[in-house]
Curated annotation (Swiss-Prot):
One Gene Ontology term of the molecular function aspect: cobalamin 5'-phosphate synthase activity
Biochemical pathway: Cofactor biosynthesis; adenosylcobalamin biosynthesis; adenosylcobalamin from cob(II)yrinate a,c-diamide: step 7/7
The species this protein was found in: Shewanella sp. (strain W3-18-1)
Name of the protein this chain belongs to: Adenosylcobinamide-GDP ribazoletransferase
Keywords of the record: Cell inner membrane, Cell membrane, Cobalamin biosynthesis, Magnesium, Membrane, Transferase, Transmembrane, Transmembrane helix
């Protein structure tokens, strides 16, 4: 394979990843199959970086003319519009299932129900409020830090969530599932590039903040995996969305705590 063909292949995989995670229209020449989707997992972190960067740009462009709370809300809105609330939906479904079901089968059945239950609604409202409040506090502390936090959190949270695919069992037996192709034939190259994107984005942060966030994310991933195993024996697409949302919130929390003591 020539260098040009190799670059074209990687660009194609990135676009497949972007098409999976966002509502951004893809070029007509981009074709998606299970093999491509598996290999595209290496770029899930970079898609998060793109979403975070666009959100941060909106925040930076508006924060000089609007109250911090409004600028943060607009930045959050950009993220939701870009993804179609993909991860937020997973968070709500996961909390509905984990909160309302007794057995793993009950939980999986409830999670598949398109209706929003009380557990999911509460989780979704609290998650959005937490993100908004933490980002507002970061914005009041330093607008540059707040924008950087958006970039880092959107990237790192997706890296952590996607890494679960490589070590855990996919438990939903549903051929129409959007996440099932990702559960098959993941390679070490995909994992290496995925993790590297998460580590490199920490360069946006100072040394203590980067180290603190790295250690917390490692511990949080372990905790999330243990909970998923106990609840349903593995993961589904919904639980990956929940993992992303939880990790994003914790990213903001860690950066706020570290920033307050520096």
């Amino acid at each position: 394979m020539s260098e040009r063909e190799s670059w074209h292949k990687e660009i194609d995989l990135f676009l497949v990843a972007m098409g999976y995670f966002t509502r951004i229209p893809m070029p007509k020449w981009v074709e998606v199959d299970s093999d491509k989707l598996n290999k595209a997992s290496r770029y899930f972190g970079l898609v998060g970086l793109l979403i975070g960067l666009l959100s941060a740009i909106v925040f930076w462009l508006t924060q000089n003319w609007l109250p911090a709370g409004v600028s943060v809300l607009l930045a959050m809105l950009v993220g939701v519009l870009l993804t179609g609330g993909f991860h937020e939906d997973g968070l709500a479904d996961t909390f509905d299932g984990f909160g309302g079901g007794w057995t793993a089968e009950d939980k999986l059945r409830i999670m598949k129900d398109s209706r929003l239950g009380s557990y999911g609604a509460i989780a979704l409202i609290l998650a959005l409020l937490l993100k908004w409040q933490l980002l507002v506090e970061l914005a009041l502390y330093d607008p540059v830090v707040a924008g950087s936090a958006l970039i880092v959190a959107h990237t790192v949270s997706r890296v952590v969530a996607a890494s679960i695919i490589f070590t855990e069992k996919y438990v939903r037996d549903d051929e129409t599932s959007k996440s099932k192709p990702l559960s098959q034939h993941q390679g070490i190259n995909e994992l290496f590039i995925l993790v590297a994107s998460g580590v490199l984005v920490l360069l946006f942060l100072k040394g203590l903040a980067a180290l603190s966030l790295l250690l917390v994310m490692i511990g949080l991933r372990r905790l999330i995996v243990v909970i998923f195993r106990r609840q349903i024996g593995g993961y589904t697409g919904d639980t990956l969305g929940a993992a992303q949302q939880i990790c994003e919130i914790v990213c903001y929390l860690v950066l706020l705590i570290v920033g307050s003591i520096l």
